[in-house]
Amino acid sequence: MSPSSPAPTAATPAAQAPFTAERWQQFWKAWKAQPQQLEGIEQLRQAVIAADQALLTEAAPWRQTFSSSPAPETSAHANPLPVAWENQNDNASGTGYRECFSSSCAMLARYWGKVGSDDEYNAIRAKYGDSTSAEAQLSALRSLGLTANFATNGDRAALEQQINLGRPVAVGWLHHGSVSAPSGGGHWSVVIGFTEAVSIHNDPNGEADLVAGGYTANTNGAGQHYSWKNWQPRWEADGPGAGWLLTCQP
């Protein structure tokens, strides 16, 4: 090197773009608390402190977000579901007063595009047995190409899960007697949605009086808001997790 030659300088690394979000997450997915990882994360901590100490405090926005509760899962389906209401009391059979189960199952079948009315469904169900028979209802629904199941271990979580999956549910409950002592042979309606305070029903018999028992009206039972407080004891009359329900899907 001649006296006039410039002194060599250290090579400057080429400027690099910051990590992408995906690349950044890869580091934490590979985290196993190994010694070299612990050393690397400490180097990162010291570098962040040198740049801005406020970033590593409990009050830092990222720290608050990181420790916050996850947002509740949202359903891809409407709540309440768009289920057409059927009135059991105008059934062509002339015995609609005892056909709440059939009219409720008809709402399920109609929702899935298998029938156009409860009278159409009732004619199919009659081939398999009486309206009060769960087996007759299951056979009728299955004959329409639907997967149908009856259970007596339902609870609120099961109903909400079905609604979130886009499936209305037929439910059997005691509509007579006071809410503290429900009684009677039972009634069927269709849960089409829910909120924190209420279950939303298409009730084929109209609007129920959940406190005293019976019905306040037998006209339009579409979208009735039945409070969990007063309806759930009528549904789970035999104890928690003892609700009768019929689920249905293609």
Residue ranges with predicted function:
Residues A51, N79, F194-P250:
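Noncatalytic regulatory segments and standalone regulatory/sensor domains
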Residues T152-L210:
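Active-site-adjacent substructure of cysteine-protease-like catalytic cores
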Residues E99, S103-M107, A136-S143, A158, ...:
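Extracytoplasmic/secreted proteins, especially bacterial periplasmic and envelope-associated proteins
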Residues P6, A10-D130, Q249-P250:
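Active-site-adjacent structural segments surrounding the nucleophilic cysteine of cysteine proteases
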Residues S93-S102, D130-A134, T152, R156, ...:
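Solvent-exposed, acidic/flexible segments
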